[in-house]
Structures are given as C-alpha cells and as structure tokens.
C-alpha cells in the first residue's frame, strides 16, 4: 500500500486499488494524473 503523502496535500489516506486517491487528486487538485505526487513528479 502506498501512502499519498505528497506536498499538494488534500489526501491523507492510503492509495489502494480503488480510485479514491486518483479521483481526489484529479478532481480537487486538478492533477493531470491520478498520482498524488503530481506537484513534484520526481519526488516519491
């Protein structure tokens, strides 16, 4: 399981196989991808 601990930070839960993290990053943070570290793509 991967934690969504990225600097953009509206999600503090666990990135599972569901779309919760993806949707929140895309919908609320205007991310291009579902990855929650879209602000710093090289920082994981």
UniProtKB/Swiss-Prot annotation:
PROSITE patterns: GAMMA_THIONIN. It comes from the Eukaryota. Its main location: secreted. The keyword Disulfide bond applies. GO terms for cellular component: extracellular region. It is found in: Secreted. The keyword Disulfide bond applies. Disulfide bonds join 15-36. Keywords: Antimicrobial, Disulfide bond, Fungicide, Plant defense, Pyrrolidone carboxylic acid, Secreted. The modification Pyrrolidone carboxylic acid is found at residue 1. One of its GO terms (biological process) is defense response to fungus. Pfam families: Gamma-thionin. Forms oligomers in its native state. Belongs to the DEFL family. Possesses antifungal activity sensitive to inorganic cations. This is Defensin-like protein 1. The gene is AFP1.
């Amino acid at each position: 399981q991967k934690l969504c601990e990225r600097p953009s930070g509206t999600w503090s839960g666990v990135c599972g196989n569901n779309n919760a993290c993806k949707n929140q990053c895309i919908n609320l943070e205007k991310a291009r991808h579902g990855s929650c570290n879209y602000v710093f793509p090289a920082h994981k």
